[in-house]
Amino acid sequence: MSLISRLKAVVAGDDYLDDDFDELDYASEDELNGVNDYKENRKNSNALSNSNPFDFMNNNRSSNVVGMPGISNSSSEVSLMEPRSFDEMPQAIQALRERKTVILNLTMMDPDQAQRAVDFVAGGTYAIDGHQERVGESIFLFAPSCVNVTSSFPEEVSPSNISSKKTSPYSLETNTTPEPAWGESKLSAFS
């Protein structure tokens, strides 16, 4: 088309040419919208880059975090108990359930009740997958499963730990060394 025919068409209002211009207008508007979207995305990304990236991650995850009741991450507690009767043993079990380490000093108890108390607390410790350790004479450590107990002390030497070679009277071996008399009294040797 020539320039004159185009001018006539514009002045006369030819529909054919108007459609062409409309398409061109829409294309230019789409291009402008794409540029505006790019500018908005650029502003949003700058806002995210200026903020702390850990805050962004924490905001998404904080809604899914649920605390466990009875468990504190701050510090561990140790409960030292010197019970005088078996009636005080449920307190030790409750402390273990609260994830506290319990040290029982049973020197003040009757030996039969002390044995019963150790059995009771050891059963409770086993039920919660805990650990138990004998620390000293009538002193015991009971710990929940969240506490690791390591012992660097060698095993105590006691009469039950000593093994002696027992020979049967029908044995063919001849033993020329006498058996040690560790458990015998010196007075009984002279009489």
Curated annotation (Swiss-Prot):
First-listed, main subcellular location of the protein, grouped into a coarse class: cytoplasm
Cellular compartment(s): Cytoplasm
GO BP, sorted A to Z: division septum assembly; FtsZ-dependent cytokinesis
Family of this protein: Belongs to the SepF family.
Name of the protein this chain belongs to: Cell division protein SepF
Region (Disordered): 153-191
Subunit annotation: Homodimer. Interacts with FtsZ.
Organism the protein comes from: Prochlorococcus marinus (strain MIT 9515)
